[in-house]
Amino acid sequence: MMNCYVTYGTYDYLSKLKEEHDEESVMLFTNSDGAALYHETNSNSFFKNAKKYEVMDKKGDVTHPGFVVLNHIPVEESERAVFEDRFKNRAGKVESEPGCEGIRILRPISNDPYIVATFWDEEKSFKNWQTSEAYETAHKNRHTSKGLPKTIFSGKPYLKTYQVEN
């Protein structure tokens, strides 16, 4: 199974680290709060301190600049199977939306939130998707008896958005 590692820090430090490992599949994410390095590999990462995930689902090859949305979803340890089953059986419509270049469903190795990462050609494409019929369909069961029960969550989900640098 493919692994994914994410580490956070300053832009200067992480861009230098990325340059030192340009043979690796690494992406630099930036926003007004700082930066993150994202590393997908079938082996261990060169990061000294990173959050480790298993890639449960991967669609699209993302290797160029754009926009990424990281949806952090805290899930109770005892409810992980329920959560994962829901994502394994998802409709998979976001991948066919204009501007969507890929998606990753990331299972945390430690007690961190799951991450659903969607990669876009630009922020505008993500915003367009949020107001689309496909978005409504994908989220139609939220807050209903057909949706995931609130008890599976160990905290409130949150989004982080970044520009993806070259």
Regions found by a protein language model. Name each.
Residues V75-E77, E122, Q163:
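Non-catalytic surface loops within mature trypsin-like serine protease
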Residues T10-H21, S78-G102:
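Short amphipathic alpha-helical segments
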Residues M2-Y8, T30-N42, V68-I73, L106-S132:
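Short, well-ordered beta-strand segments in beta-rich or mixed alpha/beta enzyme
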Residues F46-E84:
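Surface-exposed beta-loop interaction hotspot
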Residues L14-G34, T41-E54, E95-P98, E123-G155:
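An amphipathic, aromatic/His-enriched active-site/gating alpha helix that lines ligand/cofactor pockets
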Residues R104-L106, K160:
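General small-molecule cofactor/ligand-binding pocket signal
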Residues D61-G66, E79, I115, G155-N166:
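Short, low-order "capping/linker" segments at domain edges
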